[in-house]
Every structure is written in structure tokens, then in C-alpha cells.
A protein has these predicted regions:
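FAD-binding core of FAD-dependent oxidoreductases
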Residues: 54-68, 72-76, 83-108, 136-158, ...
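C-terminal auxiliary extensions adjacent to catalytic cores
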Residues: 2-23, 27-34, 38-41, 46-49, ...
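Glycine-rich, flexible loop motifs
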Residues: 2-50, 77-136, 227, 242
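Cysteine-centered functional microenvironments
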Residues: 135-140, 317-321
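Catalytic or ion-translocation cores adjacent to nucleophile or general acid/base/metal-coordination motifs
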Residues: 72-85, 356-366
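Conserved, non-catalytic sequence blocks in retroelement Pol enzymes and Pol-derived host proteins
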Residues: 112, 141-143, 373
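Short, low-complexity, polar/charged sequence segments that are solvent-exposed and flexible
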Residues: 72-75, 119, 212-214
Length: 490
């Protein structure tokens, strides 16, 4: 299967499909023509340019007032990529690095960056052959683009750095020799076009949004099972309630729960309690707010991944080369912080339902186990969930609220969007684990409602889950069961 890089809108759903299917990339004629046209314009412009052009004939950052001789312009770009590869910390997961390659190609394909066609084609070759550069999580301020991580992404183009290839971390020069690829000699502006961009942030955001859709759906399914296990009421999910407060996510969540629980014997039973705790009764409002946030963030990120985000921007048709700020990550840093909060809240309310299920209420045994005291049962999984939720709350401090000046004050406001991106991924992972622990608890609790049955949908999930995680009669080693639960919803 092949995906043609074009100027048609690239959606996150398309990205999800092409990554899952192992799709190959191919540069479309429209994109190829735009890249060639821009490079030819820039080459011609360089012949008689009468003024300094930032990053093309000058140094970078606060060194922008230093003019570089024509014979050194290629070396300038080579030096830029080498000197900016200053990332550190943990490495970025390979699937996100692959996303970075895709998004960098997409951004360069519009023909506003001045890169050589061979440079873009090599990025495509790397994507298609799963030659994935080693990129580090720390180092980007999220303005002037993701300089350090994109430098690591592009080092292999010039024969430097390391790559993941066939399960091994190797020197890119060795892999290049094996594949018969030659290092690329960068031309004027190319290094800046490669490094000035938001693809580190955007790739993390796209990956997180793909996971967010999955986790939001599981939050509803697991929440519905917990509602059944807790002998909760269906009335808070009636459509009349949500018609008078018409937030889309709230309406969708309530409708989803009604469908999930359709035909349940448990939900139809007469309830002796007047109302449920907020963690059950307010699921439509809380889960719905997260859905609305996911929807909004997706709309913003889809604009970003269909944009040219480097600097300066080259406009061949208008005979313009403009130094501006499309590299600044603020437009996506704030939404990523919002998404972090939205996903953290899914885990926050999930942990509260876990707590209720083990509290010995509504006919459920203490800690969901026979012989409490002799057995601790599901006591400690709730501790684990609480620990994870607390960590996620700490990660909800908006990275985009911070800014530290750099480059001798020339770059005096930055987005810190890369920090928003990496902590977003951490919260995605945390939320997945908390929801898995809730599923672990909910299936155990549901057993105590027998012989009554839940809905066909919930019972189907229950039956599939029981194939990998058994009912707990007496205390046992639970870590492997929690890990199996995580794998189940993954």
C-alpha cells in the first residue's frame, strides 16, 4: 500500500491507517514540482541577492547579523545540523520518530522551504525502510522549531548520528553504506529548513491523539462495566438530561452508555439508593468534556501537520523570502497541555470508581475478595492507581505557561511545547494503566452480581477479558495480571 504525499489535507485518521498498515510513502507530482520550483527560485536568487537573508546568507539566532561568504553557505548548513544535535535524556519511541519523518516530508512538500528534491526523497527512503534516527526527548524549547530533536532526526542525511535499523542501534554511516545511499551535501537554507519546524511536537501530539480516541472509548466501556458492578442507576444517562445542556461530548457519552447497557438485567433491577456518587453519576459530563477537548485538539493539530513551519518562508511566485515565526510552537503547545488535562481527568475519575468498587458497599465484599483479612484482595491495585493519578496531576502543570529566553535574548519568548509533548505522552501511558486497573476491578466486582447478566456488549468484553485474566478467589501475585489488563485494552 502506498500513500502519495500531496497538497490534499492529511488527517490524523489517515496517519493512523498508514502507520498501522505499514504503508510506503511516495512523492506526488504536485509536491515534487513545488519542491523543485522553490529550490530553483532560491538558487537563482542566490546569484544576485543584494541583501542578507536570515539563515541563508547569515548566521543563526543572535548571530543573524554576521554575513557568510558564498563559498561557505553549504558548510554553514552542515555546521548547523551538527551543532544543534544537542538532545539528551531518554530516546523517543520509534513510532513517534517515524511520525516525525512523515510530518517533516509533508511540511517540506508544499514548496515554501527551499530544500532539494533529493533531500526530501531521502527522508521518504528512511520512512519506507524503517531507518529511524535516534532522537532524544530533551532539548527543544518549542520555538525556532524543535531544533535539537530535528537535528538528530536529520543528522543521518549527512552521514552522521545513529539510527534504529532492524532492531539495532547503528551508526548511520554504516547503514547508509549497506543500503547504497550517499550522504547529502546540503545547499543554502536546507539545514535551517530541516531543523526549523514543529515536527517533534506535532508527532507526539498525533500519536497521543490516536491513543486518546482509543482510551476515551475504553473509558466509556470500562465505566459502564463499573456502573453495573456498583449497581448504579441509568437515569443520569437519559437523553432528556443532556438535551438541556447540549455539549456534544456529554451527549455522545450518555448515548454511548445507553447503547452499552442496552438489554442489561442488572441495570433494570430496582435500586434502593436514590443517587450515585459523582464518579458514576457525572460520567457524561466528565468523559464528555474530555471528548470535546480531544476533538478540539485534533482540529488544531490537523492544521499544524498541513502547514509549512520553517523559517524563512520562501514564496517563489511573489519573489519573496520572508523571515517570520511559523516555527513557534505556541499554537499547539497550549492545546497539548489541554489534552494532557483531559486525559488525566479520565484517569482521575476512573480511580474514584476503583475506590468505590473495593469499599464494601452495595453488596460487594471488602476489597472484592472472599475472606477479607486473610486476603487483601484488590486493596493495593487502588494504591497503584492513586499513585499514577497523582503523578499525572503533577504533569498537568501547563508547560506552555513557561518561557525562558535564549540565544542572547534574540529568541526571547518560547513555547516549551516540546515539554508539553513529552509529558502528554507520559499521561497517555498513565491513563491507559489506570483504566486497565479499573477493568481489573470491574470484572471482579461484576462476578458478585451473578446470576444477573449485564448487556450483550459488556458481557462480550467480560468474556474476552476472562480469557487472559481470571477471577481472583484468594490472594495471588497481581502484577502480571495488571500488565495483561494493560495489553488487553492496548
Amino acid at each position: 500500500m502506498t500513500h502519495v504525499i500531496s497538497h490534499k489535507k492529511l488527517t490524523i485518521d489517515q496517519v493512523k491507517t498508514l502507520l498501522a498498515a505499514g504503508t510506503q510513502l511516495e512523492l506526488g507530482k504536485e509536491a515534487e514540482a513545488a519542491i523543485v520550483k522553490c529550490r530553483e527560485f532560491l538558487d537563482k536568487k542566490m546569484e544576485d541577492i543584494g541583501r542578507p537573508v536570515y539563515g541563508v546568507t547569515t548566521g543563526f539566532g543572535s548571530l543573524c547579523n554576521i554575513t557568510i561568504p558564498a563559498e561557505d553557505l553549504s558548510q554553514l548548513q552542515h555546521n548547523l545540523v551538527m551543532s544543534h544535535a544537542c538532545g539528551t535524556g531518554e530516546t523517543v519511541r520509534p513510532e513517534i520518530v517515524k511520525l516525525m519523518l512523515l510530518l517533516k516530508v509533508q511540511s517540506l512538500s508544499y514548496g515554501y522551504s527551499g530544500v532539494q528534491l533529493v533531500t526530501v526523497q531521502r527522508l521518504i527512503d528512511m520512512f519506507n525502510n524503517d531507518v529511524l534516527p535516534v532522537v532524544y526527548q530533551q532539548g527543544s524549547l518549542g520555538a525556532s522549531g524543535d531544533l535539537a530533536p530535528l537535528a538528530h532526526l536529520c543528522l543521518p542525511l549527512i552521514g552522521l548520528g545513529e539510527v534504529n535499523y532492524k532492531g539495532e542501534v547503528r551508526q548511520s554511516a554504516d547503514v547508509w553504506a549497506e543500503l547504497g545511499w550517499e550522504a547529502i551535501k546540503l545547499k543554502s537554507k536546507e539545514g535551517l529548513a530541516l531543523l526549523n519546524g514543529t515536527q517533534f511536537m506535532s508527532a507526539h501530539a498525533v500519536w497521543s491523539l490516536i491513543q486518546a480516541d482509543r482510551l476515551s472509548d475504553w473509558a466509556d466501556k470500562i465505566g459502564a462495566m463499573s456502573l453495573e458492578a456498583y449497581d448504579g442507576r441509568i437515569e443520569p444517562f437519559y437523553h432528556q438530561v443532556h438535551a438541556v445542556r447540549a455539549h456534544q461530548g456529554q451527549i455522545e457519552t450518555a448515548e454511548h452508555f445507553r447503547k452499552l447497557l442496552e438489554g442489561s438485567e442488572i441495570i433494570k433491577q430496582k435500586k434502593v439508593h436514590v443517587q450515585d456518587p459523582y464518579s458514576f453519576r457525572c460520567i457524561p459530563q466528565v468523559h464528555g468534556a474530555s471528548k470535546d477537548t480531544i476533538r478540539y485538539v485534533k482540529s488544531v493539530i490537523e492544521i499544524e501537520i498541513n502547514s509549512a513551519t520553517d523559517n524563512p518562508t520562501v514564496f517563489p511566485d511573489e519573489d519573496l523570502i520572508i523571515s517570520a515565526g511559523n516555527f513557534h510552537g505556541q499554537p499547539i503547545a497550549i492545546p497539548m497541555d489541554m489534552l494532557t488535562i483531559a486525559l488525566s481527568e479520565l484517569s482521575n475519575i476512573s480511580e474514584r470508581r476503583i475506590y468505590k468498587l473495593i469499599s464494601g458497599q452495595r453488596g460487594l465484599p471488602n476489597f472484592l475478595v472472599a475472606k477479607p483479612g486473610l486476603n487483601s484482595g484488590f486493596m493495593i491495585p487502588q494504591y497503584t492507581a492513586a499513585s499514577i493519578v497523582s503523578q499525572s496531576k503533577g504533569l498537568c502543570m501547563p508547560a506552555s505557561a513557561d518561557s525562558i529566553p535564549s540565544s542572547q535574548g534574540q529568541e526571547d519568548h518560547v513555547s516549551m511545547g516540546a515539554n508539553a509533548a513529552t509529558k502528554l505522552v507520559r499521561v497517555v501511558e498513565n491513563t491507559e494503566r489506570v483504566l486497565a486497573i479499573e477493568l481489573f476491578n470491574a470484572t471482579q466486582a461484576l462476578e458478585f452480581r451473578r446470576p444477573l447478566k449485564s448487556s450483550w456488549t459488556i458481557e462480550k468484553i467480560f468474556a474476552h477479558y476472562r480469557k487472559v485474566v481470571p477471577f481472583i478467589d484468594d490472594d495471588r501475585y497481581m502484577h502480571p495480571l495488571i500488565e495483561k489488563s494493560v495489553e488487553f485494552i492496548r
